[in-house]
């Protein structure tokens, strides 16, 4: 017999999968619209940053942390918040990324009212979209903007990320044309 916690997690995963049938999901469309960026770019970034396979489908996971280069996924926002606060007490904030867009709290923590607000999916998407828009304004190109989103200093890490983003974005466009989720 499933515990209430496992049942809740299964329900959440099902809800995420149902929402992903509309691509990009409405939250991405709204955040992208507000920042005047393509929703497909925002969704591709979230898949690249926090994507996890759920029932054979790749979905962004809102309670994802990256601490000093190691990714962690949590079943609840509360658990992720607790781990985030512990990480910030132990690590330089520049080594901590949080949420759907894996926003770096050392460089962009001021965009949130508190560290745990970075785990709010809607707020994280709004910040991610705003950052992408800023990078696009500087470059005029969404692939270059994605590379700068990952590593503003550029170099080999940004080039690798641009290549990964391009593959993710092209895969999404094929999925959208076929009407199938990623």
Which residues are covered by each model-predicted region?
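Gram-negative bacterial Sec-dependent N-terminal signal peptides
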Residues: 10-13
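Catalytic glycan-binding domains that act on GlcNAc-containing polysaccharides
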Residues: 21-182
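Bacterial N-terminal signal peptides that target proteins for export
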Residues: 1-8
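N-terminal signal peptide c-region/cleavage motif recognized by signal peptidases
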Residues: 15-17
